[in-house]
């Protein structure tokens, strides 16, 4: 049924208090494994993104990238400016429960019920939320040890903005140069991670400045000292610091037992307008 037809039947057409959003759920009474990259940016229903749920009564293993809010699945893919999907990822799911995030009991003593994200893979979206629930463990960077685990990442990114969105940025000179990929996102979703056992992150020696970059200078008097306005931004292609809400939003992590080597970040981006003083 088209989304517009459903809104009409519910009497919600033109009512700004309601948001009608499609849902897609894949469930398994055993294990569930994602083996191919999913680019959800083309998954729109009457223009609306979906709430995508992957629920496994056993283990949920993500051996591929799950992405929305970007043009593609590569770390360097461009951030989009439209709304994006919300993601629900559940291992050890209680499939009989009304709550889509409900998990079976037992916690760390269980023999299954994990959610695992493989190395070099991403789970990300833009304006949607990421909700992850594991009856036992959440393993970020599964299949590797030491610093190699850091190559997996889970984050919300917000949506891309332009200077046209903000009249006060008239005269802003964007950063340029080799390797510069500036993005000033807004409207990012929340990240919520809950495990009955452990949350296992990836050891990272990465500096924040590797993915939160900056350009431009001013004097103490506020005069521009370069041709580029001072600004700082997110370089999504370089982000390898575990978990983040990179374009707004909150991060919440809870574990029934331990949290190991997990980095969680909530950065900002900014850009002032104006022109060099003559």
Descriptions of predicted regions:
Residues 1-278:
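Low-complexity, glycine- and small/polar-enriched segments
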């Amino acid at each position: 049924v088209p989304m517009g037809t459903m809104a009409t039947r519910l009497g919600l057409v033109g009512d700004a208090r309601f948001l009608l959003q499609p849902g897609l759920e894949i469930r398994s009474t055993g294990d569930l494994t994602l083996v191919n990259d999913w680019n959800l940016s083309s998954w729109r229903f009457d223009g609306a993104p979906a709430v995508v749920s992957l629920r496994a009564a056993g283990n949920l293993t993500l051996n591929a990238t799950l992405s929305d809010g970007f043009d593609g699945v590569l770390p360097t893919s461009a951030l989009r400016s439209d709304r994006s999907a919300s993601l629900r990822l559940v291992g050890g799911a209680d499939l009989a429960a009304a709550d889509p995030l409900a998990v079976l009991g037992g916690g760390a003593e269980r023999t299954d019920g994990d959610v695992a994200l493989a190395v070099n893979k991403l789970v990300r979206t833009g304006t949607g939320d990421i909700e992850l629930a594991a009856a036992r463990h959440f393993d970020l960077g599964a299949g590797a040890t030491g610093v190699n685990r850091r190559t997996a990442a889970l984050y919300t990114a917000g949506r891309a903005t332009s200077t046209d969105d903000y009249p006060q940025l008239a005269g802003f000179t964007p950063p340029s140069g080799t390797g510069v990929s500036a993005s000033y996102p807004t409207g990012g979703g929340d990240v919520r991670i809950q495990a009955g056992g452990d949350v296992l992150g990836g050891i990272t020696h990465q500096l924040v400045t590797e993915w939160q970059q900056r350009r431009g200078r001013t004097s103490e008097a506020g005069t521009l000292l370069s041709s580029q306005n001072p600004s700082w931004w997110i370089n999504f292609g370089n982000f390898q610091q575990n978990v983040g809400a990179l374009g707004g939003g909150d991060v919440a992590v809870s574990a029934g037992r331990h949290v190991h080597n997990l980095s969680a970040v909530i950065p900002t981006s900014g850009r002032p307008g104006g022109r060099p003083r003559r």
